[in-house]
Design a protein with these regions (language model features):
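Type III/flagellar secretion export determinants
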Residues: 1-203
């Protein structure tokens, strides 16, 4: 929520909230929230229970990935850096969710929502930059074959998308983020033996 500067009606930009929510296989929820307004930063962390050693290590291993995701979406020319979060330790953690909301001006917030668990991944982007929605169902092992075949299939999808984007004069920044999302959602599977079924929605 935008907040006016004390004593004025003027909202101080930029406003940002970055949230990482992790659920362990033992059922513990951990949430880390970074909020900033103008030059002020607030950090909150809460856990629904006590973590064991393996869970603490698994969470610690996501620290750089969390920072990469924040740096990417907060950049002057935003990019998606979600690969690190997608490669969470699935032997200890059940799911990872990343939410980002950044408001640079009166045009409203740019939001990003990423989810990954052992069978699915999704990323949704909405705001002034545009809208995209990419989801992957990794339960169908018959769709993409081995890693080499999968890489070739992804490359083919990207080439088709480039042609369609060129014909439709798509926004270059949004097109780049879509390709990043598509590639990252279909790479480095949590369970290598599982292959994904890819679904595309609203670009």
């Amino acid at each position: 929520t935008a907040v006016a500067k004390p004593g004025t009606d003027q909202i101080q930009y930029p406003l940002a909230e970055q949230k990482l929510r992790i659920q362990t296989k033992s059922g513990i929820d951990v949430e880390i929230v970074l909020s900033s307004q103008d030059d002020r930063l607030e950090v909150q962390m809460q856990s629904s229970g006590e973590l064991n050693d393996a869970e603490r290590v698994a969470l610690g291993n996501l620290a750089d990935a969390f920072q990469d995701a924040i740096d990417g979406i907060s950049a002057k020319d935003p990019v998606l850096n979600l690969s690190g979060l997608a490669k969470f330790d699935s032997t200890v953690l059940a799911s990872v969710d990343f939410h980002s909301s950044i408001t640079l001006n009166q045009k409203g917030p740019q939001t990003l929502d990423f989810h990954a668990d052992s069978v699915s991944r999704s990323v949704k982007l909405d705001g002034p930059l545009g809208t995209l929605d990419v989801s992957v169902d990794m339960r169908d092992s018959s769709v993409w074959g081995n890693s080499k075949q999968r890489a070739a299939a992804i490359d083919n999808y990207i080439k088709q998308f480039d042609k369609a984007a060129s014909r439709g004069n798509a926004d270059k920044a949004l097109a780049t983020m879509f390709k990043d999302a598509f590639t990252q959602m279909n790479s480095d599977y949590v369970a290598p033996s599982q292959q994904p079924k890819i679904t595309l929605a609203d670009v």
